[in-house]
Structure formats: C-alpha cells, structure tokens
C-alpha cells in the first residue's frame, strides 16, 4: 500500500481550557518541587525553549511565511501569525530603540493565566508564564537569531497588561547549524 499523494497532514488540537488547566497544574507542581521562584522560572524557560525549537518547524510548515528581512518583520510575524495560530490572541507590538532591535509584545489577554487570579503566597518572583519566553527564544534560535526574552510586566503581579520584552542580540552563524552532506 502506498500513501495517497498530496494529502495535507492533519493537525490535532486540544481543548484550550484543558491545556490551560494542565499548565496550571504543572506550575503548581513545580512550585512544590522547587523552593526558589528563580528555579521554577528557569525550569519553565528551559521547557519553553525545548518546545520552541520544535514548534518552529510546525509554524513554518503551516504558516507559509516568507523570509523576513528585518527584526520588525519578525516581531510582526510572531505577534500577528504565531500568537494567533497557537494562542488565539494578537498582541500589540512596540519598538523601544532607534536601532530597532528591542521590542515589546503587549498581551491584553493572557490565555495561560486565564484561570489564575493571583500568584501563590510567598511567590512574588514567580514568572507564571515564563514558558512563553522560552518558546520565543527557542524558536528564534532555530532560525539563527539570538534573543533575550523576558517579562517586563505581568498582570498577575498587579500590572495593567502582560508585556514580553524581546531584544535581538545577533544573527547566529548558519554554518554551525547546517547539515553535513
């Protein structure tokens, strides 16, 4: 038997509420496992990074985006296409400097924190959605861009919005990542 030609792969989606509740349970378990918020934040970032390195392939296959020629194009693709595709939201984009390598994604609604009213007592340094920073950083690294991705504001910490800061550091050496023939 052979595979049918030109059949598009099926993409399975899970219920958003199930994903958000499962993520909440994961963060709660990490808070039990690690005493320091910094350790939980580091673990969430590492998990996100690993997800981002794999998610970028799915994103590029499904979105059919063309090659970007500037950091602002990349940020707009992340905000308008990637966030919409995977989280169902479109964050606002702002640029912070004249060299156009520092940007912010402003999330007026954060789906990962939908069922969270406040951070647990004694966990003021916890970045509940640090997974997102890791995902963005991992995906950017896979397209040869080093970036620093951090939370600048967080609704769960009393801010009016959730803001993710992205600073593009440099383009990575593509030769290092090419497959050897």
UniProtKB/Swiss-Prot annotation:
InterPro entries noted in UniProt: Bet3 (IPR016721), NO_sig/Golgi_transp_ligand-bd (IPR024096), TRAPP_component (IPR007194)
Record-level GO BP terms: Golgi vesicle transport
Pfam families found in the cross-reference section: TRAPP
Main localisation: Golgi
Keywords: Endoplasmic reticulum, ER-Golgi transport, Golgi apparatus, Lipoprotein, Palmitate, Transport
Compartments where located: Golgi apparatus, cis-Golgi network; Endoplasmic reticulum
CDD domains attached to this UniProt entry: TRAPPC3_bet3
GO (cellular component) term, any one: Golgi apparatus
Lipid-substituted positions (S-palmitoyl cysteine): 68
Functional note: May play a role in vesicular transport from endoplasmic reticulum to Golgi.
Oligomer and partners: Homodimer. Component of the multisubunit TRAPP (transport protein particle) complex, which includes at least TRAPPC2, TRAPPC2L, TRAPPC3, TRAPPC3L, TRAPPC4, TRAPPC5, TRAPPC8, TRAPPC9, TRAPPC10, TRAPPC11 and TRAPPC12.
Family statement: Belongs to the TRAPP small subunits family. BET3 subfamily.
Protein name, per record: Trafficking protein particle complex subunit 3-like protein
Organism: Mus musculus
Lineage, broadest ranks: Eukaryota, Metazoa, Chordata, Craniata, Vertebrata
